[in-house]
């Protein structure tokens, strides 16, 4: 967490970095404690706890009658935020199945509330594309480093990051509008604040690096709103642009500095 924060916000001193780390850990733990309520509590309770900000960005995109992709950032309020949307919008998205089938079923059932459609990773994009064409919102997360395969290196907080290059092809195929989104856990009332941002403009242009940079810039903007809400434990800068060990391993051995990411 600290390495990622230092890399993304080099202007902050160690005291501020540590305060963001502690705040982020607390927010994620609090949000996790709310999962049973979110997944199995009363419907009206869930609806009342959700607050949608700048909703017009999403509604205007839907009014265009084009498919819509939600570019979602990993955050403390992620699960609760999607549940806050589900009563009003038809959602679909990819998730990673858990190894324990019982727990996986419980998680799937909770996320399926209000008709949302979680699709196991590996299901393929055909079902997602069909859902988009039928008016379902596609929930797409692309802030994590998934390695070189299917990725290009593009700036993310001024560092080269392996960035999935799948979304531009999906958008080009479906003529979809991409609306960035992040969900914040509210520690005061255990609610969730879902923030929408202006859709990506001139996207895609057909250049994989330019398109990846546009997407990364949009994700950066969602993070800057409240940095402590972001899931900083993600392996953001795992893959080295050149052959060799992961960049985190290189930092641990003192071969490179955080500023060299």
Q: Where does each model-flagged region fall?
A:
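Hydrophobic alpha-helical segments typical of transmembrane helices
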Residues: 1, 81, 106-107, 166, ...
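Membrane-anchoring hydrophobic helices of lipid-metabolizing enzymes
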Residues: 1-72, 104-106, 115, 258-261
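Catalytic core of membrane glycerolipid acyltransferases/transacylases, capturing the structured
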Residues: 13, 66-122, 145-151, 155
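Non-catalytic C-terminal accessory region of glycerolipid acyltransferases
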Residues: 18, 22, 59-64, 87-88, ...
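N-proximal short alpha-helices
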Residues: 31, 80, 101, 140-144, ...
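A conditional alpha-helix N-cap/helix-loop micro-motif detector
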Residues: 48-52, 75, 100, 118-121, ...
């Amino acid at each position: 967490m600290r390495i990622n924060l230092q890399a993304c916000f080099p202007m902050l001193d160690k005291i501020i970095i540590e305060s963001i780390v502690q705040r982020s850990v607390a927010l994620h733990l609090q949000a996790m404690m709310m999962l049973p309520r979110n997944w199995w509590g009363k419907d009206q309770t869930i609806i009342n706890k959700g607050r949608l900000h700048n909703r017009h960005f999403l509604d205007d995109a839907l009014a265009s009658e084009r498919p819509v992709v939600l570019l979602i950032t990993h955050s403390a309020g992620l699960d609760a935020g999607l549940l806050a949307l589900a009563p009003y919008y038809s959602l679909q998205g990819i998730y990673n199945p858990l190894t324990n089938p019982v727990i996986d079923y419980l998680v799937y059932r909770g996320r399926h509330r209000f008709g949302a459609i979680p699709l196991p990773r590996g299901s393929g994009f055909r079902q997602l594309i069909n859902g988009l064409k039928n008016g379902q919102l596609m929930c797409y997360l692309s802030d994590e480093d998934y390695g070189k395969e299917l990725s290009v290196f593009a700036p993310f907080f001024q560092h080269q990051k392996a960035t999935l290059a799948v979304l531009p092809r999906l958008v080009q195929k479906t003529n979809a509008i991409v609306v960035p989104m992040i969900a914040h856990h509210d520690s005061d009332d255990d609610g969730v604040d879902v923030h929408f941002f202006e859709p990506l403009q001139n996207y895609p242009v057909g250049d994989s690096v330019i398109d990846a940079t546009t997407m990364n810039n949009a994700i950066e903007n969602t993070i800057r709103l409240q940095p402590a809400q972001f899931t900083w434990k993600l392996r953001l800068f795992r893959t080295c642009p050149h052959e060799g060990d992961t960049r985190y391993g290189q930092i641990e051995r003192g071969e490179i500095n955080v500023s060299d990411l």
